[in-house]
């Protein structure tokens, strides 16, 4: 199964609580932190919620 490399590119300061919670649930902390997650529907939905804050690459 494909995986997604997700990198936080913008800060969560001043963002709504649901976006902050999504970033934390994905395991992202500081700006430029990166995680690799499976490309399933749940993860894709989370990425869609914060698409303006992250860069996503398929690995």
Swiss-Prot record:
CDD domains: Ribosomal_L30. Coiled coil: none annotated. Gene3D superfamilies: Ribosomal protein L30, ferredoxin-like fold domain. One of its GO terms (molecular function) is structural constituent of ribosome. SUPFAM superfamilies: Ribosomal protein L30p/L7e (SSF55129). One of its GO terms (cellular component) is cytosolic large ribosomal subunit. Signal peptide: none annotated. Belongs to the universal ribosomal protein uL30 family. This is Large ribosomal subunit protein uL30. It comes from Enterococcus faecalis (strain ATCC 700802 / V583). The gene is rpmD.
């Amino acid at each position: 199964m494909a995986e997604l490399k997700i990198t936080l590119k913008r800060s969560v300061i001043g963002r709504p609580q649901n976006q902050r919670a999504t970033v934390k649930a994905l395991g992202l902390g500081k700006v430029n932190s990166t995680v690799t997650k499976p490309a399933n529907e749940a993860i894709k939905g989370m990425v869609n919620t914060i698409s303006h804050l992250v860069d996503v690459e398929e690995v």
